[in-house]
Amino acid sequence: MADQKILDKISKLLALSESDNPNEAAIALERAQKLMKEHSVTMTDVSLSAISEHNESIPTILKDGRLYTLLGDIISRSFGVTFLVISKHNNSRTAISGVCFIGPNDRIETAGYVFTVIARQLAIAKKNFLASYRSKLLEEMIEYFTSIGYIRDPETFRKTCTSLPKLYKSFFYIKSSCESRLRQATKAYLRGWLSSVSQKIDDFVYEEQETLLIEQYIQATYPHLRELRQHSVRFNREQMSHYHKGIKDADDNVNLFRGVTGDMHRRELGFKS
């Protein structure tokens, strides 16, 4: 395929060929055809030059596969782009390293930026949730060990045991179960949070030609794509309560607004807390 600068120049000339000025239109079309012949460029090449890709690494907060696919779907729906998951193969293991947004040149960079912005907001929500849930779990464990007689003076114990790691020193055998509860609760909460954000999104109205171009770009650039399989998720009663808390927190604290810039239809999502 020809150099991107050549393709851009041809695209501009073809746009000028639709001018209301007959002479100007004829000259522009002649120049475009000359460049296309000179560089062996087809109309398909010119059309596909309007489609490109933008990669973003997956933050630690999104290492759970369900989270980055949820967020990727939110971005795709809002900006009218497609997202792919980037994987790296190391010996017999496959690691997910990033996401790739594919679509019109004037939207993919903004889509990647908003992906990062929402991920940062999610990280803040996770930090706040963990701080709250750790305190709740610590108190729950202290009350439990008090009820079975392992802690005789809970008030004094609370003054010295101010965190879960300190509790583990006294009752080391509960560490595994507590950390598992923390992980599962956090996953449920974050999925609920993203579910709420997803409901706030207005789907981008695709143009049929644009959709076809994106599909052609993917087929030409990534002919050996594989489908990413994910298992369905089931929450127990406690995890479901955390899921709903995530929904409520995002409902209360996240407001999305969208800006449109000129003819580029640049859609930006921002946060107001």
What are these model-derived regions, one by one?
Residues M1-S57:
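Long alpha-helical, hydrophobic tracts
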Residues D3-Q4, D45-S273:
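Extended, helix-rich structural scaffolds rather than catalytic motifs
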